[in-house]
Amino acid sequence: MENTYVGQRDYRFNVNQLSYRGIRRRKWGKWVSEIREPGKKTRIWLGSYETAEMAAAAYDAAALHLRGRGTNLNFPELVDSFPRPESSSSEHIQAAAQDAALMFKPGRLSEPALESGQGLSRVGLSPDQIQAINESPLDSPRMGWMQDLEVADYEELYGQFFGQHDRDEFFEMQQFQSIWNSNN
């Protein structure tokens, strides 16, 4: 059975491929995670997961418990968010790993919170909401705030983002008539 090992240096793989410690990809697409018990030749099976991130989070929860806070983690910014096993038994480590993996389950409304309390979030829209957005005209009342902005507001906003030099160049170019507006 051939596995794609992630986390080790192998130049056969695409340079852009994500790599995480303690995981590998099965040829049928599932990601698996396991960790070696310190001082032993045995491994603790942490599970099979849908995504690499789920498997990597499972590994991190186990590594944090077995090796301590000084160990290299896949998601070091989440060290305080990972579940802790009740004991050092393989069953408790596996349970904590499963819980950590669920933090990254696809379809969750938000990613795990970072130490600062600021996490990435996803907005889930229903098919009806997406259809309503696609069907509303660009000049609908919902877009009215754009019409309320004066030219001075645009200049100020542009200057804040791109600097004075670029702003002046941009508005200088705006004085020339666009080829799309010509009546030729």
From Swiss-Prot:
<comment type="function">
    <text>Probably acts as a transcriptional activator. Binds to the GCC-box pathogenesis-related promoter element. May be involved in the regulation of gene expression by stress factors and by components of stress signal transduction pathways.</text>
</comment>
<dbReference type="InterPro" id="IPR001471">
    <property type="entry name" value="AP2/ERF_dom"/>
</dbReference>
<keyword id="KW-0238">DNA-binding</keyword>
<comment type="similarity">
    <text>Belongs to the AP2/ERF transcription factor family. ERF subfamily.</text>
</comment>
<keyword id="KW-0010">Activator</keyword>
<feature type="DNA-binding region" description="AP2/ERF">
    <location>
        <begin position="19"/>
        <end position="76"/>
    </location>
</feature>
<dbReference type="InterPro" id="IPR051032">
    <property type="entry name" value="AP2/ERF_TF_ERF_subfamily"/>
</dbReference>
<keyword id="KW-0805">Transcription regulation</keyword>
<dbReference type="GO" id="GO:0009873">
    <property type="term" value="P:ethylene-activated signaling pathway"/>
</dbReference>
<keyword id="KW-0936">Ethylene signaling pathway</keyword>
<dbReference type="Pfam" id="PF00847">
    <property type="entry name" value="AP2"/>
</dbReference>
<keyword id="KW-0539">Nucleus</keyword>
<dbReference type="InterPro" id="IPR036955">
    <property type="entry name" value="AP2/ERF_dom_sf"/>
</dbReference>
<dbReference type="GO" id="GO:0003700">
    <property type="term" value="F:DNA-binding transcription factor activity"/>
</dbReference>
<keyword id="KW-0804">Transcription</keyword>
<dbReference type="GO" id="GO:0005634">
    <property type="term" value="C:nucleus"/>
</dbReference>
<dbReference type="GO" id="GO:0003677">
    <property type="term" value="F:DNA binding"/>
</dbReference>
<dbReference type="InterPro" id="IPR016177">
    <property type="entry name" value="DNA-bd_dom_sf"/>
</dbReference>
<protein>
    <recommendedName>
        <fullName>Ethylene-responsive transcription factor ERF022</fullName>
    </recommendedName>
</protein>
